[in-house]
Amino acid sequence: DIPAAFNNIHRKHSIIYSCSLLYYFKNELSQPDLVSESFKETIKFAETISRSEFVDTLDSHSEDVQNFSKWLSSTGVDVIVAPTTFGVAPNRDDEELSDMNLFYNYMHVPMAYFPMWVDETDHLPHGLMCISNLKDDYNLISFMKKIEKKYKSNEGYNFKSKG
């Protein structure tokens, strides 16, 4: 299990992301007709964040990245393999789930994805994500090449094809 110290990552990511958008898109925000409602909501959230909270969050982000890297190294795990998402993509107006993609992105770890199959019911792709530790890209690439060699066919990737 991931240590409880990392439980607040979704909020930290939201703070950094929304405040960065507020800063970098000031010109676009002066023309509200050109900005989507979801973008405006993100900006509204950013405007509730104080400068000191933003700076503190940036500082803690660097610490989180280093602490996660140390923790992952201590586990002896080379690569984490998990589903790309918890399920199908949510509708635009649905609340965003706190999925692991966001977590690993926040932690700056290398990630790669494999589409594995298309679900016969919802006709949407499903796949796997693979994650390695910070600055361990070559290990991840080597692992991914092994997966590709084992499971790739002319029709794509399929766990059942080469057992």
Where are the predicted features?
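Surface-exposed charge patches
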Residues: 70, 102, 145
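Glycine-rich phosphate-binding loop signature in dinucleotide/nucleotide-binding domains
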Residues: 73-77
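Short, surface-exposed loop/helix-turn segments at secondary-structure junctions
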Residues: 13, 84-103
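Short helix-loop capping/hinge segments that flank enzyme active sites or metal/cofactor-binding pockets
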Residues: 12-69, 115-128
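Gly/Ser-rich, acidic/histidine-flanked active-site/gating loops
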Residues: 1-12
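Structural helix-boundary/capping segments
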Residues: 55, 59, 66, 107-163
